[in-house]
Structure formats: structure tokens, C-alpha cells
């Protein structure tokens, strides 16, 4: 080495990240050789940048060329020296840094270099893109050293290839080829890269061979991050999930949720996010807005990455011809358009960026979505004045006023639970609940879901998005269903009502939880009754024990015994006195008679009976029983039976008794007889025989035979003498009559059908045209309005005109013209009203055109004619199929007969 070379600086240029692969030498012996080679390379680069010539004592017989690609020093000349003058001493640069320092916005020189040296190669089954391929200009020169410098603000990448240049003793002896470049971002692979025989990006180390290989940078097709090794790229692809113009580093993916970067598009409701193709429901809120596009970002890092990828060049130079994307280079634009083609969706919306498979779907999207609507293009509902930006949403809203519901189709039936669904997609989602399949997993936690909609809702809890806000209290929610449930608190709506107690709830889950309280899980082992709580069951079992003891009760006192032996032992004792015996008998009779005289309901005690009479029948128990105790008071009951006329003549005459309006307790057919129960109010004494039914009070008259025979269960027929009874006040009698009359009316009303109330058009005289129009209206109503709504308006018992007016008025149209009703209008005045039926039910441009050009009669016949024609065609097809089947059977029979 010459003195001039010895005087060169001993450190490489500033902000350089250099990595040397020098064969299979041990690492502890490479340090001196590596530093000396770095010093020589840095010296050559500094000499070339100053335009000075290299000393001839560096082996003057060989030609050394250095090429510098640096936009900051474009005026510097490329030098080629063979010897000569001394080299001035440059300023000593800063020591090399092991780690690369990433700038906020790379300089344009890197892009220029990539454009100059772009010759993609090595495309053998590569699943990524090759953006840079730096190759020596003179591959055939045996004694050529090429140095390519790609410089930005913080990094200088060197590629040096010459195994004959005398740069150091170790290098000359081993004849190694060195690649000096920026360190890969994957620091974990540094040691492996030094030991492997393949240089970064595919450049092989060749000892004693002057042929130079190319260096290739591998780029991720989703986030455009570059790698020099395929292994590093494949490892990156396991974590890179986004293709919207930015990427998430591996370290960021594994950190907590606050540091995960997500792009967002701030758009109107119902728009589609450009960055992730999600709807407005899942768009990511951000606070850092891009001044050149409608995107916003959560972190400064994601914003700077977006600026570098999208807006580092003039966005207007490379706009996408399919969507509204604008890219920074022609290469990225080409890759972006290829993604449209690979996805099979070459048609995209220019406003929201959503792409479609065919142009028809794009036109429908532009017609019915808010991408083509503005504040002036609004449609309001005539019923509730609600405003809509899309026609399909308005049509769906009007169906709610009409009562139209989506019909579940039997062809979409689950083979497991036999439930029907609206479409095949909903059926497939439902089947996953039986199979347990959950193909949609969250990338932020371990949860999995059976539907994509459920996954989108779940992601909002990670991102903290709450796009649904209450207009009353400004509280925000992540899911729309939760907002709807919250709004019912403000409106007081409780649609879920309990059938047992009548209590209402907002949610169906609340009703299901409440319904469990009405379940009776505690069943009695002695009878069929069930109870809600265990205490109620214990109380009921005590009643069974009390009744069992009452079967062995003493007739002289109130004591009861479990067995007959104990009762006999008690009676043999002889401890009862006559006074005690009388009181005991009276108490026993009172206990025996504790059933209600009005509804025949039994009770355990007289106190519960009195409470029942006060609460249920709203009467005073003393007025019902008088001055006598309940055991002494006998309810005057009689039974009547409806029998045949020939049986009535044969019945024994029973003296009539003065009674008032009664209550029909029950009337039913039992076997071959009719049993009727009736409660009659006794208004006075009479010389008649009464039927006292203590327990059941059933009077059964068989209908077969010539004479009706009477058989009464537990009935005592006594001749009751006339005697004074306690008087009842007129007020009490009036209340009794009112209560019993109401009970009788309610019982009769249950067996009557509700009369038709739509008789307003019954007296109208119809002409032949009106009759034809009336028939067509009936067919039209059946075809256009769903059966539930028709049944609500009294169809088919009500007239066609009445149902037609109710349907139209329910949609917000006032049909009354002064005091005139529809039936009072003439034939010509009815036409506009009939035309309204099409307006509120059918949203079809062709039908509207027919209404504007033809009479309403012709339009109705046209619509009905199509339906009849379709039915005729189906009938003809069915007949043809039957004829074909008949011919086939005939041919088969002929073949069988021949055989």
C-alpha cells in the first residue's frame, strides 16, 4: 500500500450501515480485516466523490472504476484513473452505525436510483414483487471493481465486487468477494446471514471468479416493505394482513392494542372505507387527518408511512383508472390495478372505492347508495315524515307501515331443527350453530365466530369504536341493536309481555329470565300440583297431612288422628262433655263448608273464603252469609238441562221459585247428556222443592230413551218449609244482580262470534262496471297486500272498498273529501284513489308509466292478466308433464308386454 493510501481516514462515511460477508473465517479473526477493508472502501468512495484520481501505486496495471449514483452530487464527475497525482486528505467521517436510522420521509434520490436500476429478474415462481435489481454494467470485465452507492439522508448502501483489488492483506490472500450494504431490519438474522454462503438478496460468493451476480430486493405485495432475503419476506407475510397501502410491523402486531396502527376513512354513513373495504359500521376513528385525501390516522407513524407511499410524488400523476386511489409511481399503479384484476372485481366506485364484479352491480350501487346522493336528493315518508337518502331504504320502511313481513321459504329449511329461513346465506350461517364451525377468528384475541357480521361487531370492542349515538342522551354504543334497546328506555316501549302475570320487558332475554319464576319445579308426590318454591311445597304437604288426619277426626272435639286405632283409643277414653261435643260438631261443620257460593271454589279456612269474596267478587261476606256462619248458610243452587222436546213433556213438574237473573256457570255435553250449571239468586220464600248441591251441584239428564232420568251426584232433595229468612238490603241485592249479570254476559259473549262491522257499503247499487272493478280490486288486494294486514282490516268479510281505503289511509293518504266517503263517489272519482294503491304498494317504473298513459281499468286487467297467464302457463306445463309421464308409462308397458 502507498503512503497516500495509508493517509486515508480510518473510519467509514457518516450514517452508513455496512455489513460484510467474508467467507468461512472464524468471527474472532475477522475484525481486523473487516475494519481495514471498510477503511479502504470508504477512502475510495471519498476520493471518487471529490473527483480526484487514484494513486498509480494501487496496482496500476489494473483498471479500477467507481460509479456513484447520488442525486445530491450529480454535478460530481465519475472518475477513472490509471495513476498519477496525489490525493488530498478529506475530512474524517463519523464512524459507521450498526443500525439503520429510518427517516420520516426518504429523499427522492432513492426512488430515482430504483427507477434507473430496475430490471426485475429471478421471477421463478416468486409470490412477491421485485422492484430493484442492481447489476454490474460490465459483468465480463475480469479486473473491474464496481461500487454502486444508493444514498438518502441517513443511509448509504455499497455493493463492492472485485476479488483482485488490493484492499488489504486478508482480502488479497483469500480472494473474497464483499457485499457492503445497509443492515437488514430483521436484526435476528444477522448472524445467520454472515455464516451462510449466500449473500443478501441472492448474490453468491464466488472465490476466484470475476463474474458478478445481481442483487435483488424482495418486496411485500401488501405493504411494500423491502427485504433482501426470501426467508425474511416469508416470515413477514405471516404477520402482514393488510393490503390498503400500509403495513404493520411484527413488533407492533404483538404489542398492546393501544399501539396497533389502523387507517381510517372519515365518510358519511353507509359509505365504504377505502382502506379496509369495510362499511361505515366498522370504520376506524382517527385524529390525524391527511390534507391530500380523506383519510385519518391514529398515530403519527402510520400517517408518515401513508405520506411516503401515497403522496411522496404528485398524486395527480398516477391515478387509478378503476377506483379513486392515487399512487406515487407507475410501478405501484400497475401493481394496484393488477390487484383489481386478480380479485375479479374490475369495476369500482369513484367515491367510496368499493369494487364490483360487473358494471350492473356498480350502477345499482351508485343508484341506491349515498355515493350518488346529496343533501337535496332526499325522500321522506308520508306517514311519519322520516327522511331517507336511498330509495330501497324508503321502500323497506313503507313495508313496516303496511305490515308486510319477509316470508320464510320452506326450501331454506334446516334439516336438523326444521326451521325455515329467508335465504340460503342465513341458512348456512344457522347450520354452523349445529356443526360448531366458527371460521371467522379475531386477529386481536382468541375468540372465533360463525358469521362475519358477528366478527365485525366484536372488533369494535377492541378499537373502542361507538358509531351509534343516542339522540336523546348522547350516549354512544358499538352495536346498533344495543342502541335500539336503549331507545326503548326513553320511549317506554316494552314489547315483551309475560303471559302469566302480564309484566312487560324491553328485551326478550329479560322475559325468558322472568318466565323461569313462573315455572313450578317443585312437584307434590301425592298429587299433580307443582309449586314455585320449596316453602310452598312444604305448606301444601301439610295440607295433605291435615286432610289425612281429618279422615280420622273425632266427632266430639277438634282433634284428628293419623290412624283409626288412635281415634278409637281416643273415643274409648270418654273425656268429652256435652257442651264440648256441641261446639266440636259446629266447628266440624264450619270446616266442612268453606266453599264459595258464587264460584264454587274451595278454601281451607273461613278467613280465606271471606278474603276471596271481598277481592274477587267485591262483596261483603256478611251480606252473602247473613247472620249465620258459613257452615249454616246453604247456597241455593239449581240445575237446568236442555233436552229434546219429547223429553220435556215427560219431565216431572217442579214448583217454581222466585228467582232473579242468574249466572251461567257451565254448560257442556257429557256422554249422551247435557249438563248445565246455573246460580240463581233467591229473592223470597216459596213452597217449592229446592235442590241443594253441597259439593258439585251437577244435574245430568241422559238424552237417549223415551224418558229422561235424573241422577244427581251428592244431591239431597228436601222439602223446604216456608220460614222467615234474614232480610237483605236493596243495595246489596242491586250489587249482586249487577255482578251476576256481568258474569252471565261474559259467559254468553264467549260463545258468540263477533259480527262484521263493515256494512257501510252493503246498500250500494252497483253497475256492471262497478261489479267488474270490485272483482278486480279483490284480486288485486289479495295479490299486493299480505294476508296478515288483510285479516287485520276484516278481510274477506269486509268489502273490497273498505279494505282498500284502510290500506291507503294507513300509508298516510287522506281519502275523505269533505263528508263524502269512498262508496259515495262516482265511478270516475274512484280512479285516482285506486291509482294510489299502486303508488303506496308497487315501486315499479313500468307500472307508473302504464298508469300515466292508460286507464286504471286496463292497468288492473294487465297486472291481473299477467298473473292469470302465468298460472295458465304453469297449468299447461303441468299437463304437459303429465302427458309425458303417461307416454313414458305406455312405452314401458309395451316393452314389458313384448318381453
Curated annotation (Swiss-Prot):
Its main location: nucleus. A zinc finger (C2H2-type) spans 218-240, 288-311, 318-340, 347-365, 379-401, 412-434, 440-462, 468-490, 496-518, 522-544, 552-576, 594-617. Residues 45-55 have a biased composition (Low complexity). GO terms for biological process: heterochromatin boundary formation; negative regulation of DNA-templated transcription; protein localization to euchromatin; response to ecdysone. Keywords: DNA-binding, Metal-binding, Nucleus, Repeat, Transcription, Transcription regulation, Zinc, Zinc-finger. GO terms for cellular component: chromatin; nucleus. Residues 21-31, 874-899 have a biased composition (Basic and acidic residues). It is found in: Nucleus. This is Protein suppressor of hairy wing. It comes from Drosophila virilis. The gene is su(Hw).
Amino acid at each position: 500500500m502507498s503512503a497516500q493510501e495509508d493517509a486515508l481516514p480510518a473510519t467509514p462515511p457518516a450514517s452508513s450501515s455496512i455489513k460484510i460477508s467474508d467467507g468461512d473465517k472464524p468471527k474472532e479473526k475477522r475484525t481486523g480485516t473487516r475494519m481495514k477493508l471498510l477503511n479502504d472502501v470508504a477512502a475510495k468512495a471519498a476520493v471518487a466523490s471529490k473527483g480526484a484520481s487514484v494513486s498509480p501505486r494501487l496496482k496500476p496495471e489494473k483498471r479500477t472504476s467507481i460509479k456513484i449514483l447520488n442525486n445530491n452530487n450529480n454535478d460530481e464527475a465519475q472518475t477513472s484513473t490509471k495513476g498519477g497525482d496525489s490525493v488530498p486528505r478529506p475530512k474524517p467521517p463519523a464512524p459507521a452505525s450498526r443500525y439503520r436510522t429510518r427517516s420520516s420521509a426518504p429523499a427522492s434520490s432513492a426512488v430515482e436510483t430504483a427507477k434507473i436500476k430496475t430490471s426485475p429478474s429471478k421471477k421463478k415462481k416468486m409470490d412477491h414483487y421485485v422492484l430493484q435489481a442492481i447489476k454490474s454494467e460490465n459483468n465480463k470485465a475480469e479486473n473491474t471493481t464496481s461500487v454502486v452507492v444508493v444514498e438518502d439522508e441517513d443511509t448509504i448502501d455499497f455493493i463492492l465486487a472485485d476479488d483482485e483489488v488490493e484492499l488489504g492483506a486478508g482480502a488479497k490472500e483469500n480472494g473474497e468477494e464483499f457485499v457492503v450494504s445497509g443492515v437488514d431490519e430483521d436484526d435476528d438474522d444477522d448472524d445467520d446471514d454472515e455464516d451462510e454462503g449466500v449473500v443478501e438478496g441472492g448474490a453468491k460468493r464466488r472465490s476466484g471468479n470475476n463474474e458478478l451476480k445481481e442483487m435483488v430486493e424482495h418486496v411485500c405485495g401488501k405493504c411494500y416493505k423491502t427485504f433482501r432475503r426470501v426467508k425474511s419476506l416469508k416470515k413477514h407475510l405471516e404477520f402482514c394482513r393488510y393490503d390498503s397501502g400500509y403495513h404493520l410491523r411484527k413488533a407492533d402486531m404483538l404489542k398492546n392494542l393501544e399501539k396497533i396502527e389502523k387507517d381510517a376513512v372519515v365518510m358519511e354513513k353507509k359509505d365504504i372505507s377505502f382502506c379496509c373495504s369495510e362499511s361505515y359500521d366498522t370504520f376506524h376513528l382517527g385524529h390525524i387527518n391527511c390534507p391530500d385525501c380523506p383519510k385519518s390516522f391514529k398515530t403519527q407513524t402510520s400517517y408518515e408511512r401513508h405520506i411516503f407511499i401515497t403522496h411522496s410524488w404528485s398524486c395527480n400523476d398516477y391515478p387509478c383508472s378503476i377506483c379513486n386511489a392515487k399512487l406515487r409511481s407507475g410501478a405501484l399503479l400497475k401493481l394496484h390495478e393488477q390487484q383489481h384484476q386478480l380479485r375479479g372485481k374490475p369495476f369500482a366506485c369513484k367515491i367510496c372505492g368499493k369494487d364490483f364484479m360487473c358494471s350492473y352491480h356498480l350502477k345499482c350501487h351508485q343508484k341506491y347508495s349515498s355515493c350518488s346522493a346529496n343533501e337535496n336528493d332526499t325522500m321522506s315518508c308520508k306517514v311519519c315524515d322520516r327522511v331517507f337518502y336511498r330509495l330501497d331504504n324508503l321502500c323497506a320502511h313503507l313495508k313496516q307501515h303496511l305490515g308486510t313481513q319477509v316470508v320464510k321459504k320452506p326450501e331454506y329449511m334446516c334439516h336438523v331443527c326444521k326451521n325455515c329461513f329467508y335465504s340460503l346465506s342465513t341458512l348456512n350461517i344457522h347450520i354452523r350453530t349445529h356443526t360448531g364451525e366458527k371460521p371467522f377468528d379475531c386477529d386481536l384475541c382468541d375468540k372465533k365466530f360463525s358469521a362475519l357480521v358477528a366478527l365485525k361487531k366484536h372488533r369494535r370492542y377492541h378499537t373502542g369504536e361507538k358509531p351509534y349515538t343516542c339522540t336523546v342522551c348522547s350516549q354512544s354504543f358499538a352495536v346498533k341493536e344495543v342502541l335500539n334497546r336503549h331507545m326503548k328506555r326513553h320511549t317506554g316501549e316494552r314489547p315483551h309481555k309475560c303471559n302469566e302475570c302480564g309484566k312487560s320487558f324491553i328485551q326478550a332475554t329479560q322475559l325468558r329470565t322472568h318466565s323461569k319464576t313462573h315455572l313450578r319445579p317443585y312437584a307434590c308426590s301425592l298429587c299433580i300440583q307443582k309449586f314455585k318454591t320449596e316453602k310452598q311445597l312444604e305448606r301444601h304437604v301439610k295440607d295433605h297431612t291435615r286432610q289425612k288426619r281429618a279422615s280420622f277426626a273425632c266427632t266430639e272435639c277438634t282433634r284428628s288422628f293419623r290412624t283409626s286405632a288412635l281415634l278409637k283409643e281416643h273415643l274409648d277414653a270418654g273425656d268429652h262433655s256435652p257442651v264440648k261435643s256441641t261446639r266440636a260438631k259446629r266447628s266440624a261443620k264450619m270446616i266442612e263448608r268453606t266453599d264459595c257460593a258464587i264460584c264454587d271454589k274451595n278454601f281451607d279456612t273461613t278467613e280465606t273464603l271471606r278474603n276471596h269474596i271481598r277481592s274477587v267478587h267485591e262483596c261483603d261476606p256478611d251480606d252473602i252469609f247473613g247472620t249465620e256462619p258459613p257452615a249454616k248458610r246453604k247456597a241455593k243452587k239449581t240445575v237446568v238441562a236442555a233436552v229434546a222436546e219429547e223429553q220435556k213433556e215427560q219431565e216431572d213438574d217442579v214448583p217454581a221459585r222466585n228467582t232473579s237473573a242468574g249466572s251461567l256457570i257451565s254448560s257442556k255435553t257429557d256422554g249422551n247428556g247435557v249438563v248445565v250449571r246455573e246460580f240463581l239468586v233467591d229473592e223470597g220464600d216459596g213452597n217449592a222443592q229446592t235442590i241443594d248441591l253441597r259439593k258439585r251441584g251437577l244435574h245430568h239428564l241422559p238424552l237417549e230413551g223415551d224418558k229422561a232420568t235424573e241422577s244427581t251426584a251428592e244431591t239431597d232433595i228436601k222439602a223446604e218449609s216456608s220460614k222467615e229468612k234474614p232480610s237483605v238490603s236493596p243495595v246489596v241485592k242491586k250489587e249482586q244482580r249487577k255482578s251476576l249479570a256481568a258474569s252471565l254476559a261474559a259467559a254468553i259473549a264467549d260463545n258468540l262470534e263477533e259480527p262484521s262491522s263493515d256494512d257501510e257499503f252493503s246498500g250500494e247499487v252497483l253497475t256492471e262496471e262497478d261489479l267488474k272493478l270490485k272483482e278486480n280490486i279483490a284480486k288485486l288486494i289479495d295479490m299486493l297486500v299480505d294476508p296478515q294486514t288483510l285479516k287485520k282490516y276484516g278481510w274477506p268479510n269486509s268489502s273490497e272498498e273498505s279494505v282498500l281505503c284502510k290500506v291507503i289511509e294507513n300509508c298516510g293518504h287522506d281519502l275523505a273529501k269533505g263528508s263524502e266517503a269512498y262508496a259515495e263517489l262516482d265511478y270516475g272519482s274512484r280512479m285516482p284513489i285506486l291509482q294510489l294503491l299502486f303508488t303506496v304498494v308497487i315501486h315499479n317504473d313500468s307500472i307508473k308509466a302504464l298508469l300515466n298513459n292508460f286507464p286504471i281499468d286496463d292497468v288492473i286487467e294487465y297486472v291481473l292478466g299477467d298473473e292469470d297467464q302465468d298460472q295458465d302457463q304453469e297449468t299447461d306445463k303441468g299437463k304437459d308433464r303429465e302427458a309425458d309421464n303417461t307416454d313414458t308409462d305406455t312405452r314401458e308397458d309395451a316393452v314389458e308386454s313384448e318381453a
